[in-house]
Amino acid sequence: DPAFNSWG
C-alpha cells in the first residue's frame, strides 16, 4: 500500500 509503505 503506497499510502502507508513503499514496498507493498
UniProtKB/Swiss-Prot annotation:
Q: What's in the GO CC field?
A: extracellular region
Q: Record's InterPro entries?
A: Kinin_peptide
Entry keywords, A to Z: Amidation, Neuropeptide, Secreted
Q: Which compartments is it annotated to reside in?
A: Secreted
Q: What domain of life does the UniProt record list for this protein's source? A: Eukaryota
Disulfide feature: none
Q: Write down which residues bear the modification named Glycine amide.
A: G8
Q: Could you state one GO biological process linked to this protein?
A: neuropeptide signaling pathway
Provide the function of this protein.
This cephalomyotropic peptide stimulates contractile activity of cockroach protodeum (hindgut).
Name of the protein this chain belongs to: Leucokinin-1
